[in-house]
């Protein structure tokens, strides 16, 4: 069986911490992972089999194995991955356990919180291990952020040297890291600056069309006399050519990182509407933090993306729509299908194109395990 799982690539910039870069890299894939640890619904029944067979999920099988007490030698025997890398991954699991000893964000000592950031833990991960909350965790995420800023634990901004450090180079090609301190560029409030959020890693149904939109946005901003600031991390895109904008942050498109950039740049506003699903998913979170979102209002984006709200709007306007229901169990699905018949379209809110979507022509498609299993 052959499955196409990836259509693009991503690139992370490493300073001195492998742990930081592997965690950032796993977040930047854009498949809903929060890092090496702290992910939802990643459990393997036959762990030895998963470790012995290279797949796109094996790195998470290694995380589970380390949490279950597998030794580095045993994992090496099954995976043949160099023990140096396995040792670094074990550092992440060990530090997760250390963070889990705290019950309040305020109880985390400054040195422990700083080391967590050096090891690539996001504010979201730290909140999950310390507070163990439910839901989308936006409030808890911001609690960690506030504590971190209170302690002066902020990411450094470094230039990427494109000539392999043969000589100093003053580029506008930037990334953020906790492995070192300080800024390689100067910051001041600029009312004539705009941040554009790119598309991140390409995936099936989300590709070069959003890069075209992003490039046009930054070019138009420059023509209008605005300083253009791009955040993106896909090396295949034109928008990550640092000649295209005034500043390029080659970094995560996460809520945490975008706020970090906004805190430093103090822009006139942020454009989320040209990068596809990842920026769209950030729109309401940024709006709730009083970040000026240019273009379509985040409230309108949410009204279009959220299927319940969109359906209610159609009803209010008297516009016909296909029969649909929000379902959480197979029994509910079967009951709905008995009413409307096949085929049925299955998809969540806040997705573009074919992501997380399926057309079912019989019950086997929605009751059987995925091809991965």
For the regions a language model picked out, list residue spans one by one.
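Major-groove recognition helix of helix-turn-helix-like DNA-binding domains
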Residues: 86-91, 141-147
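Single conserved hydrophobic/aromatic residue that forms the stacking wall/gate
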Residues: 1-8, 13, 366-373
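Short alpha-helical segment immediately N-terminal to, or the first helix within
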Residues: 2, 64-65, 115-116
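Long hydrophobic segments that form regular secondary structure
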Residues: 9-10, 14-42, 53-85, 214
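Regular secondary-structure segments
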Residues: 63, 67, 90, 94-97
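Amphipathic, well-packed alpha-helical segments that form the structural scaffold of globular domains
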Residues: 26, 30, 90-94, 222
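N-terminal beta-alpha lobe that positions the nucleotide/phosphoryl donor
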Residues: 45-49, 56, 74, 95-133, ...
């Amino acid at each position: 069986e052959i499955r196409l799982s990836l259509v693009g690539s991503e690139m992370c910039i490493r300073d001195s911490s492998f742990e930081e870069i592997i965690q950032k890299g796993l977040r930047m894939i854009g498949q809903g992972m929060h890092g090496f640890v702290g992910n939802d619904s990643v459990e393997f029944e036959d762990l030895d089999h998963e470790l012995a067979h290279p797949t796109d999920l094996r790195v998470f099988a290694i995380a589970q194995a380390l949490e279950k007490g597998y030794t580095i030698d045993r994992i090496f025997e099954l995976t043949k991955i160099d023990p140096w890398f396995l040792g670094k991954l074990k550092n992440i699991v060990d530090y997760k356990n250390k963070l889990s000893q705290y019950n309040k964000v305020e109880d985390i000592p400054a040195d422990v919180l700083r080391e967590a950031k050096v090891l690539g833990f996001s504010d979201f991960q730290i909140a999950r291990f310390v507070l163990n909350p439910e839901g989308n965790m936006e409030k808890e995420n911001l609690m960690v952020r506030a504590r971190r800023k209170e302690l002066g634990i902020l990411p450094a901004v470094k230039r990427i040297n494109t000539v392999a450090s043969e000589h100093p180079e003053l580029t506008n090609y930037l990334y953020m890291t906790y492995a070192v301190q300080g800024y390689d560029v100067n910051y001041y409030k600029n009312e004539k600056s705009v941040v554009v959020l790119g598309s991140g890693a390409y995936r099936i149904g989300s590709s070069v069309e959003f890069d075209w939109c992003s490039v046009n946005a930054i070019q138009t901003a420059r023509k209008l006399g605005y300083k253009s600031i791009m955040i993106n991390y896909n090396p295949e895109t034109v928008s990550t050519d640092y000649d295209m904008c005034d500043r390029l942050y080659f970094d995560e498109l996460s809520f945490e990182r975008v706020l970090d950039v906004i805190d430093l740049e103090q822009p006139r506003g942020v454009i989320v509407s040209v990068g596809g699903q990842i920026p769209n998913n950030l729109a309401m979170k940024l709006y709730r933090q009083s970040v000026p979102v240019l273009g379509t209002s985040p409230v309108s984006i949410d009204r279009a993306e959220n299927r319940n709200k969109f359906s209610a709007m159609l009803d209010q306007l008297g516009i016909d729509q296909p029969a649909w229901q929000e379902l959480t169990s197979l029994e509910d699905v079967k009951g709905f299908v008995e009413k409307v018949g096949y085929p049925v379209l299955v998809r969540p809110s806040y997705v573009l194109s074919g992501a997380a979507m399926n057309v079912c022509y019989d019950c086997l498609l929605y009751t059987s395990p995925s091809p991965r299993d």
